[in-house]
UniProtKB/Swiss-Prot annotation:
It comes from Xenopus laevis. Residues 23-33, 90-99 have a biased composition (Basic residues). Residues 94-153 bind DNA. Residues 69-82 have a biased composition (Basic and acidic residues). This is Pituitary homeobox 2. Keywords: Cytoplasm, Developmental protein, DNA-binding, Homeobox, Nucleus. GO terms for biological process: anatomical structure morphogenesis; embryonic organ morphogenesis; heart morphogenesis; regulation of transcription by RNA polymerase II. GO terms for cellular component: cytoplasm; nucleus. Involved in left-right asymmetry of the developing embryo. May play an important role in development and maintenance of anterior structures. Could play a role at the interface of lateral plate signaling and heart and gut morphogenesis. It is found in: Nucleus; Cytoplasm. Residues 17-37, 58-106 are annotated as: Disordered.
Amino acid sequence: MNSMKEPLHLDHLAGSRVAAASSHHHHHHHHQHQTVTLVSMASSLGQRSGECKSRLEVHTISDTSSPDTADKDKSHQTKNEDSSTDDPSKKKRQRRQRTHFTSQQLQELEATFQRNRYPDMSTREEIAVWTNLTEARVRVWFKNRRAKWRKRERNQQAELCKNGFGPQFNGLMQPYDDMYPSYSYNNWAAKGLTSASLSTKSFPFFNSMNVNPLSSQSMFSSPNSISSMSMSSGMVPSAVTGVPGSGLNSLNNLNNLSNPSLNTAVPTSACPYAPPTPPYVYRDTCNSSLASLRLKAKQHSSFGYATVQTPGSNLSACQYAVDRPV
């Protein structure tokens, strides 16, 4: 039985070895198949990547070789350069060159400007031909010259108004306080027409006229004083006849009617009315009553004394009214 078991055991071992070998061979064959598929896939991927690289290289070569792309690249580079540059460089590029004119060119341009300040296109072209300049330069020169001319005209007008017409207007447009310092307009009715306000200022019309005291008194007196004046003026011829060398035709003798020397020639009985009050004085009710009382007192007290020539006898009617007391 043991002998029978041993060969069976060997056969079994051989069979197991064959099966193992076959199984190992099968596994190895499968592994080889997997490696083949991987290698084939890698080779295919490598081919594809190579094709892509070749395609990219072809595209890049074709892009760089085209003129449009080259111009685009140049423009992009110039833009970057412009952006990198500073602002003063731009200003220097945009600034125009100043034109330096010769003396002959300036003489020709000035002579044309004196004749015509606004030349048209044809005239400017002719001037450009004469002066060897461009039409644009001639146009700019005329524009600047007109601006300078306008500025000079404005300055001259301002100087004329300041120097020529200034003193005249200042003399005519003085304030009222400087022109009439002796009285104010608010107290016009209270003060009246005093001769001080008239004598402080030069009025050639009134100073040249020899004003009649009777007419001036009739202008500025009340109705009561006018009636008394008419009666007293009626007595003037009889009073003047007693004075030797008196002339009624002259106005100076009429101015001397209010002097006390004429009143002494008239007797007391021949003058029943009060003598006229000083002329050219504005009278209200209070002033007229005070003046009449003072004159009555003088009439009774001063007739017996010798008369003294007053210094106000040679004055005019306006000044005489100020010197005599009221």
